[in-house]
Structures are given as structure tokens and as C-alpha cells.
Design a protein with these regions (language model features):
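P-loop NTPase motor domains
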Residues: 1-13, 17-206, 213, 268-281
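Short, glycine/polar-rich helix-capping loops at beta-to-alpha or helix-loop-helix junctions
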Residues: 2-6, 224-229
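Short hydrophobic alpha-helical runs that function as membrane-insertion/retention elements
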Residues: 15-18, 214-219, 237-241
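P-loop NTPase motor core of the ASCE superfamily
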Residues: 33-79, 225-313
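Residues in the short beta-alpha loop(s) of Rossmann-like NAD(P)-binding domains
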Residues: 134, 221, 243
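Conserved H-loop
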Residues: 186-187, 210-213, 217-224
Length: 313
């Protein structure tokens, strides 16, 4: 969106980081570039490379080799995911060569350059404004029904980038506790489907509670949040209109109300534009109407097609 143009009064407090596959953005999502603390960078590097390669920590043959290469990079002066490939090559064992080939095969994709650096990237993403928006262009997100084992390389890379950004958000949450912070994660269903994403989401919620921050997960279906611990830790719930009876029942169950009650089903099915089913911190459930008091904000975040927008005006 053109938020700086559509909300000129606070334009100076809006920072938009648009991550495209251009060379200037090379390595900006590399764990060793985006994370401030070396320990956090190493941990994220492990998560990303095990996610991309499918190597489990329970794999007694491959995981120790990969872990050793990552640790060696962490202890080096120049740090970046491309350096992990170099360390694996130096290892020389067939297992290390195989892992190196696997990782290297993913670096050929244009926007994969965002994830992989050789340790020479000097700039980094900073969140020094009141409203910081990180966008990644050309993401290829998997279909909701696609099994993890069937993800294409582009889909794996796309989800990996969202995991990096979400981890960066966790780092942001842990900043100054005296300042209230908000993190909004769009298309959250993509990483809620994978083990690393679920673990990260629970960390975000717990950190939000202790570090004076609100974390919003924007997802397509209530069923995307299937972790019971996570469900119990979500304080506020918003659900918009649905006509699919299965999704309606799942949503009502998520809100803790009778999913078989036809009145409840009708209430969710008949919601109008600007209305949603809402559950507050005390567990009370009801329909609320959202009134955008400031028209500037309404138009700034209006994502409808231009023709439809003009008709509504």
C-alpha cells in the first residue's frame, strides 16, 4: 500500500521495507544479518537450514554434521548462510558434501538471495519508526491443503522467509519493556502448519504477555490454530463472516460456544461488512461493529479493487 502518501500526517513515522530480489537486498533475511545477537543468529540458522533440507535433529548422521558447520560459521569473523556451504565442503565427508549440494541447489532461485549472504552484507533491517512494515515480494505460498512433504522449493523458501521475519518480530518484542509494541503477522497459517512455525508462534505469544506487546495472527481459518497451548494463550479473538458450515462450526468451537446451535451458526453466517464475532479477555462473546472513525485510515488500508472502491465512495 501507499501508506506514506495516504496518511501524510504520520508519514515521517512510517517505514516500509520492501524486500525484492534486487541485488541491493541480498542477504537481508540471512539469520546472521538480521539478528542482533550471535547466539540468536545461530539458533535461527539451524532452524532455517533444517527446515529447508528436512534434516531432523533426531537424524544422528546428518544433523551433527550440519550443526558443526553452522557453529564453525558462528565462530568466524565473516558470518552468513553461504559460509555454511563452504564449511561443509571443507568437511569433505560424503554426508557433508550431500548436505552442501542440497543447500546450494536452493541458492539459485532469484529471491533466495534474500536468505543467503557471504558475510559481506553491512546494512540490516531496523525498526526505528512508530509503524514499520516489512513486505517480501514474489513469495510463493503453499496452498492450505498442500502437505509439507509436497512443498516446492519456492514454497519452502517462502515459508522460511516468513519464519525469519517472525523470529525478527520476536526479537523486536524483547526490546524496551516500558514501551507497548504491536506485531501483526499476515498469512500466519503458512508457518502455523510447520513445526518450527508452531514453536515460534507460542514463543511470540508468551513473549508478548511478559514484554508488554500484542501479537496478532491473521489467518484464513480458525482450524489453522490447532495447538491447544496456543489456543489457551490467545486473549482476543476476531472472526469474520463465513458461509462454510464446517468452518463455522470450527470457529464457534474455537470461541467456546455451542457449535451445533443454529442460532450461533446463523449469527456467524449473517455477519455484514464491518462486523465480526469477538471474544474479549474475559471470555465474553458477541457481535461487534467496527466503525472506522477516520476516513483517511479507512482508505489507506482499503484493499478492495479500485473500481469497487470508487463505487463505494
Amino acid at each position: 500500500g501507499n501508506w506514506q502518501e495516504t496518511i501524510p500526517d504520520i508519514a515521517q513515522e512510517i517505514k516500509i521495507v520492501n524486500l525484492t530480489s534486487e541485488d541491493k537486498n541480498r542477504g537481508l533475511l540471512d539469520p546472521y544479518v538480521i539478528m542482533k545477537r550471535t547466539k540468536d543468529a545461530e539458533s535461527l540458522a539451524i532452524d532455517i537450514l533444517t527446515f529447508l533440507t528436512g534434516i531432523s535433529s533426531r537424524d544422528g548422521e546428518k544433523f551433527p554434521v550440519l550443526r558443526r558447520a553452522i557453529r564453525s560459521v558462528t565462530q568466524s569473523k565473516k558470518r552468513g548462510l553461504l559460509r555454511v556451504i563452504d564449511k561443509l565442503r571443507k568437511d569433505g565427508s560424503p554426508v557433508a558434501e550431500n548436505i552442501a549440494d542440497h543447500i546450494e541447489s536452493m541458492t539459485d532461485y532469484d529471491f533466495a538471495h534474500l536468505l543467503f549472504s557471504d558475510g559481506d552484507v553491512e546494512q540490516s533491517i531496523s525498526l526505528n519508526r512508530q509503524l514499520n512494515i516489512i513486505q517480501v515480494a514474489d513469495l510463493v505460498l503453499p496452498d492450505k491443503d498442500t502437505k509439507f512433504e509436497e512443498y516446492t522449493t519456492m514454497e519452502l523458501l517462502s515459508v522460511a522467509m516468513l519464519i525469519v521475519i517472525s523470529t525478527f518480530a520476536l526479537d523486536f518484542i524483547h526490546s524496551d519493556r516500558s514501551i507497548f509494541k504491536m506485531v501483526d503477522l499476515d498469512e500466519a497459517w503458512t508457518f502455523l502448519q510447520v513445526a518450527q512455525g508452531k514453536a515460534l508462534s507460542n514463543k511470540l505469544i508468551r513473549a508478548g504477555r511478559s514484554m508488554n506487546a500484542a501479537v496478532y495472527f491473521v489467518t484464513q481459518n480458525s482450524g489453522d490454530v490447532d495447538d491447544e497451548k496456543m489456543k489457551n494463550n490467545i486473549g482476543l479473538k476476531f472472526a469474520f463472516r463465513s458461509t462454510d458450515i464446517k468452518e463455522i462450526k470450527n470457529t464457534l468451537e474455537f470461541f467456546g460456544v455451542d457449535k451445533e446451535d443454529e442460532g450461533n451458526q446463523k449469527r456467524l453466517r449473517d455477519l455484514e461488512n464491518g462486523q465480526c464475532l469477538f471474544q474479549d479477555l474475559y471470555g465474553r462473546v458477541g457481535v461487534i461493529q467496527i466503525h472506522p472513525v477516520f476516513s483517511d485510515l479507512f482508505h489507506a488500508f482499503d484493499t478492495r479493487p479500485p473500481v469497487q472502491t470508487e463505487e463505494m465512495r
